[in-house]
Regions:
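Radical SAM enzyme [4Fe-4S]-AdoMet core and its adjacent flexible, acidic
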Residues: 1-4, 116-225
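Conserved alpha-helical substructure of the radical SAM core
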Residues: 1-122
Length: 225
């Protein structure tokens, strides 16, 4: 085969590879019960943008992606557990033979019915944790008590046998606690901890977050449950 023909064949193979959809991210809502200082989506209790897609719309997206060969989906937000259609979408994804179904959550919202849905459908969990220290974690989320809720629900996930991984964002406010936080999480039975950095978009683009130093804020900024 001539070099030019071989190069064209390789290029054609690359193009076919690009036509294959491997992973689908579905942002179900911009709403969130927390107001994390570094949030790239600027999510919060009063979201900047309204939800425009219905559960039926997301079902169609799952179906279209499956028809293109996609076999992995992650439900994100905002906080995806606030979306009432999440259980229905998870069930539909499994019916469409998605092999990997993951929910990326802050871990504060986990009623028994939702936990049962996760277990019944073999859902993988990705959970944001910012520190082993409750004060540091709550300073990032802007919600006193959020650390307690997240850790409690992480323990419930582990006991239920769910596959759990942690997204640990390294910031100046927590940089001295990263190793301690990893050890703390391993003590809960969670080995899969991925350390990440802030994104310089949304609230993450503000000066405090660019250097990774979200502050606790005034009493008006830090809410309680």
């Amino acid at each position: 085969m001539l070099p030019a023909a071989a190069a064209k064949l390789t290029a054609d193979e690359d193009l076919r590879a690009l036509d294959e959809l491997r992973f689908l991210w579905l942002e179900l809502t911009n709403r969130c019960n927390l107001t994390c200082a570094h949030c790239y989506a600027e999510s919060g209790p009063r979201p900047l943008r309204k939800d425009v897609l219905t559960t039926a719309d997301y079902k169609r997206l799952l179906e279209e992606a499956a028809a293109l060969g996609c076999r992995a989906v992650q439900f994100i937000g905002g906080e995806p557990t606030l979306h009432r259609g999440l259980p229905e979408l998870i069930t539909r994804a499994r019916a469409l033979r998605y092999e990997h179904v993951e929910v990326y959550t802050n871990g504060t919202v986990l009623p028994d019915t939702l936990l049962s849905c996760f277990v019944d459908n073999g859902v993988s969990m990705a959970v944001s944790v910012y520190a082993d220290d409750p004060d540091v974690h709550d300073a990032v989320t802007g919600r006193i008590g959020s650390h307690r809720r997240t850790i409690c629900n992480l323990q419930r996930m582990v006991v239920a046998g769910l596959d759990v991984r942690i997204g640990l964002i390294a910031m100046d406010i927590s940089k001295g606690r990263v190793d301690k936080t990893v050890s703390f999480l391993r003590g809960l039975g969670i080995e899969n901890v991925r350390i990440d950095v802030t994104r310089s978009v949304g609230r993450g683009g503000s000066p405090p977050c660019r250097v990774g130093s979200p502050q606790r804020g005034s009493p008006a900024q830090v809410q309680t449950w």
